[in-house]
Amino acid sequence: MGKKKKTEETAQPKKTSRSDVKERKELNKDTEFTCVKTSFNSLVENNYLSGGIQEIVLNINKICFLSYQLLNYHFTRLIEENKPLPEITQSLFYQACATVSVMKERKEKIDETDELYISFSHYKEHVGELPFRDRMGNLINNLNRQQLTMTENHLKLNFYKRFHKYLEIKTGETRKGVIYKWLKDIYAIEYSGKNFFILSMRQWLKYPPSEVNIKMHSSHFVKIYHKILKTFEKYPYSKHIRTFNLLPTKNSFTLSTIEICSSCLKDIIGYFTKTQVPDDFKENKLVYWYEFFKIEKYETKTRKFANTIYTDGKIAVIRLRKPKFEAPKPKDVKKTQYEQYVGIDPGVRSLQTSCNNEGRVLETTTPSYRNDCKMKYACRKREMWYKKWEHYEMWRNIPSFKTTNLQKMRDYFEYVYPNLNTIFQFHLYKNFRGLSFRSYCRGKATMDKLCKSIVDDKKTLVGFGDFSQQHGLVKKHPIAPIQKFKHELRRYCDVVIIDEYNTSKTCNKCFQPIELYKNKIIRKKRDGTHSKARMSIINSVIRCKLNECKLCCMDRDINASKNILFLLQLQKEGKKRPECFNPKNMNDCDTPLWEDKYVVA
């Protein structure tokens, strides 16, 4: 048969729904899911099965790594050659995974005219032995679903910040208030103004860059990202400008988890036995699950196994199903009597600084939390393993893949791909995954100890500052688990979110503005000598501007926690916040662009 002409009308196939999927969706309406994280060895006692799953995890991670980079190269090539981009769907990711893998047990047909295969052929000779996908179809489907989600999040969540920086570079405008006003007009559904710059940007973007539009027109916004990235590459030595990938990539060579569902279990059994799985697998799938995995000890009367396990060969996450309960009504804290009131100021340098109504102050610094969680130990261990590795110099000199230059991408492939198996094998046999699991276990214990020290076996009401931490707020500074801490604290006491406005800038004694403390500081140089004493500002210490105030100097975080405690007590009594803690309406800065700042995208 010849190919059908484009003019021929083809009947669209009717969309069918599987009975098991329909049944599962109905069941999910009345249930919710929870997870239990454990070591993989405690779940699987069969060494043959454990070793086989290790091999499968490694193979799927290779496919994930190669497919992500293929799509980045493919989209960049199509944009450079002015060819239309394919829609970003799960089928596209499956096609990419099929391109970078092979079938060992049967022959496969390869369409050498396909654009994706043409992109892969540009650097295929550097890859070496490709991973296999025999009896891996369902595992790859689960991987593709995750890849699609990661790509949508990558495009949606990063656009505002990168577009903000793009406007700053193109116009030279550094006032954030002005750029915010532009973005507000650019993001608006309808714009009735006559600002030439806003109109040109809206015309270039074509669609308002909301999350819904970015998801709906993802291929179009990849072109926008390409333009932004090309602009960023012109400033390689600017610290505040960071390059990025058009699409997400697997940034680490450490093995990631794979999702094993019932269909995947059927494939795994066929992979081990090299025979057809019995036809009664669907009816007896739970028998196979309980035979291969020790799941019974994690089930209870209400929590039952949900036919899914996530594993990277070192840890295992078991998904359990439980009945859906009605959400409890929010408690009226004004009518409840408490034994203790606590104000908590979360932050970056300190995970939390708390002060209760008796004046007891507790502070947990981020370095001390990371030390208790064995995170610092894990960092030192990883660094030691890398430095003792015989291929350390090769590893250290891996070039960047964050570029729009196709030749630089091919140079990356030529450098990395011949050593790909060596790198993955090193991360497989060294205990990188075990270090992460140890930090997770120690983190749970540390968080439990911290919450108990704050509550102190009393009925407690906590006022928690509404600090919304952004990743990268302080360059190269580790992030603090503020949201995790807040959710964990709700298990021990009642938590009320308090607006932090001006709590760090107002004296807790007289409610007057404060200023940063100044003093002479002697700094130690790298060569061991000391500099001359010089007047400097100490950011962590404040003093009240009012000379009559009793507050001489105090830690800035402790002052903020006392103000949060005061606002909590006012809210408990139903009183209004003082004027010094009320946000004032900022005047809109409608500064027009100068003529030399008119930029065509």
For the regions a language model picked out, list residue spans one by one.
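Positively charged, helix-rich recognition surfaces that bind polyanionic ligands
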Residues: 2-81, 87-97, 101-127, 132-150, ...
